[in-house]
Amino acid sequence: MVANEQQQQQQEEERKEVKLIQSPNDNNKYRYVKLKNGLEVVLVSDETTDQSSCCLSINIGSLCNPREIEGLAHFLEHMLFLGTEKFPVEKEFVNFIYLNGGSYNGTTSPNKTNYYFTVNQESFEEALDRFSSFFISPLMNEDAVNRELNAVDSEHNNNMQKDFWRMDRIVNDQFEGHPMSMFFTGDSSTLKRDDIREKVVEFYQRYYSANLMKVCIFGRESLDQLEEYANKYFLPIVNKDVKVPKLPPLAITSKSIMIEAEPTQDMDLLKFVFPIPDEKLCFSKNYKNASASILSHILGHECQGSLFSVLFNKDYAFSLSISSNSFYENMNKIEIQIHLTKTGLENVDEVIALLFQSFEFDTPEYFFTEKKLLSEINWKSFQKSAPASTTQAITSNLFRVERPEETLKYNNFLEQFAPEKIKEIQSYLRPDNMICLFYSSTKFKGKTTEIEPHYKIKFNKRYIEQSDFDKWKSFPKNTNLFLPKENPFLPIDTTIKAPQDHSIHIPKEVYNNNGVKVYHSLDHRFNSPKARVNIRFELTSYGNNQSMVMWNLLKKSLKEVLNEKILYYLSVLDFSMKLQILTTHVELQCYCFNDIIFTALGKVFDFLMNLDLNDMQFKRIKEKVAKRFLSSHYLSPYQISMRHLSLHNFNCNSMLLDKQEYLKKVTKSEFLNYFKSLFSYINFSAMVVGNASIEDACAFGEKLNSFSNRNSACPGEVFKLARVNLPSNTITHQREFLYDTNQTNCSSSISFLIGQFNRKTYATTLVICSILGSAYFEELRTKKQFGYVVNCAQDCTGNAISMRCIVQSHTKTPEEIFDATMEFFVGFEKTLDYFKTSPSDFKDLIENCQKQNTVKQQSNSAQSSLYWSFFTFCGDFEFEKKKYEDIGKITFDDVKQYYLDHLSPNTANLRIFAAHCYPQSYQIPDEVKPFGNVKVNLLRKYEHDNFKENHGYLSSKVNLQK
């Protein structure tokens, strides 16, 4: 008893020493605890949360892989989810999380590995018990090892044609002899060996030690209860007193390198990587002066005087981006990417010369002052994140801060301006300290001599010589390069407009005139000076080739014309704006400080309603859209099969090849006249939520209504997406080759049409999906190893309900995927019937489904996004409440009948459309296999219009009656 009291007293003393700095707008309760085994834990108590979360991060990642077993750290991350001594059933944890409304994941980065989950609050302790056992007694059974090898191999195969992974790999490979040059993901060629289980266990035993781990536990419980959980479940993790391996500095050891490589997608870019090995400049440790962040902001600026502005006005570049990355203290790098135009492609040396000219400046203090002001406002008006985002951020920050007290404020901790640090970083941005990747889809085709072994990247490599330096120096100094001016749009008025009494205010209609409707909700809960505005464009024509091409051109024209004067300045103030070209409609989303959001939107709509471009601008946006369309052919196969599914099942008939052909022919005058005509008959529905008054919302409605030559469109003429009415007792297969000749994966998207939307059917769909998703994943991915991408979920696009299964595989054919899917649905009846024998489990299923579909939002941004999703789905801002009630009324008999009527392969109501994509190395069968008494159809390419015309469409009206 005395010992326990002494232990409690000691813990109380330690807590007094560590008090986490907390935002005045954050009502969570926090506690830092260091367990006896050396494990550092942050506890977060949020008495309002519906979901709980835990994240464990370990300061060991892919950089610690043994050179002879590349990918081992990533493979271990996979293995820890597959059974422990306490919970030996392989998918015990995964199934528990899914059945209790949660999600989980693991990520392996170069310097750390993260494991995290969310779950319904009531199941939190049980989830912690299962989760913590990963780090105490994992099984890593031999058969699980062999199966998960296939999963890792499939994951790599899924990434092989993605240029992000390819660029990263070919650049890192140049740090010869350094751990950074290793193949981080791993595949069967690096991991398939007789002793792989022994090696993965050895890696775990060597590095997985409590003193290298950080944990964050987030729940509704009190801090004392959460601390009890921490001791109960994480104290048994062994402290082996392991040190993170001392790795060599990341540096250029000989000459700078030029890599010339072929991308997968249509792109021409230059990527510059500058390693910075100086430990005192470590980016993640210099968070109180943000020197790397300020330098990145200046170099990546897009307004007048910036490098991008010069390149843009010379028609050399479409875009420029910069990132600063820190792995360990002696491993930092700055990366700059420039996407080139056709003109820029012919002037690469001048582009490089201008890049190095742009590095020559002294940093004025106003860049720091602006960043500090924004940081202070964001800290003062702190907005909660989703539980999993919170736990991941906290564990990550624990590794970076000087003192645990600073963990929560890590990203908002600007204290001193350090121009000397910025100057030191600049000193590493030299032509003799870089790797340059020239990544071009046209320049090097058929002209490369080397092949990278893991991603099959075709490339050339040469050292950069003094003659290159001299050539770049020979370009005259460009007088248009200078430091951009101070930001003219800094927020001035951040006054909160409503009392923060935590009352809920559903958006209400406050303006309705001449085809313009505005809905408004003033925030009383989140104490944020920001607002969100969403605008739906209600169009008389949409979904065809012409409209899709024109809207893509318009989207590019926004940044083309407005970026330098206003949009970029706003973007650095946490202003986000997206013109979304969706299957259902077009919408503009905007989120920003309330005192500038309507000014920005006014400028945007003035541009849209008075659209004009010069010839150079139109040429450039047309080139951008052409690249985007061509790159769409190189998406992952599962994304392409989903696109084919949409093409054949909805009243939008925009085929990618047709869009490309139409784009080639369209002229500037046709583009301008199209929107002049379209905007003469258009309606708008807008939602204003957050720190904006009714007067602000109504004034914005008046702005939308004031445009000359605009008339309201008749509601019956406004485009509405509708779903094809698939025939009963019929399976329709659509087969097509993939465009990418190097793609080795196939994919199938299989849709079971349920019918028109109604509330009971939708609620039943949500209930059955809460079982289906994990069961389908376990069967086709875990057990049968069909591939990395396996998913089953509901889809209500076009106000019709369907169940959609997606699989991508490099080891199976689409026919095998389809057969396995149908076999799964035959066996799924037994899974359902279990709940008939266990009413208590069915009751739990219903309750968990309710919780999963009505999660409390943690911020103004998240809440407003949820409101908008309900409005665009069914026009009812309070649909969440109805959904909760409807799910609660679903019985087992409802679920079983739903299965028998719509999903059982034996039903006469079966309505399936299956879109299959084949690599060009495959043979597409000419016939389709019969399936019992079900009629089976086969469609080929270009038959979508006839198919839709023959079958007609379901009504797109939403029935909100019970």
From Swiss-Prot:
BP GO annotations:
peptide catabolic process; proteolysis involved in protein catabolic process
Q: Which E.C. number(s) belong to this protein?
A: 3.4.24.-
Q: What protein does this entry describe?
A: Insulin-degrading enzyme homolog
Keyword Hydrolase among record annotations: yes
Listed GO MF terms: metal ion binding; metalloendopeptidase activity
Q: What are the top taxonomic ranks of the organism?
A: Eukaryota, Amoebozoa, Evosea, Eumycetozoa, Dictyostelia
Cofactor field: Zn(2+)
A Pfam family annotated for this chain is Peptidase_M16_M
**What are the alphabetically sorted keywords of the record?**
Cytoplasm, Hydrolase, Metal-binding, Metalloprotease, Protease, Zinc
GO cellular component terms, semicolon-separated: cytosol; mitochondrion
Q: How is the cofactor bound?
A: Binds 1 zinc ion per subunit.
Q: Which organism is it from?
A: Dictyostelium discoideum (Social amoeba)
Region annotated Disordered sits at: 1-21
Q: Could you name the domain of life of the organism this protein comes from?
A: Eukaryota
Q: Which parts of the sequence bind Zn(2+)? A: 74, 78, 155
Quaternary state and interactors: Homodimer.
Active site per the UniProt annotation: 77
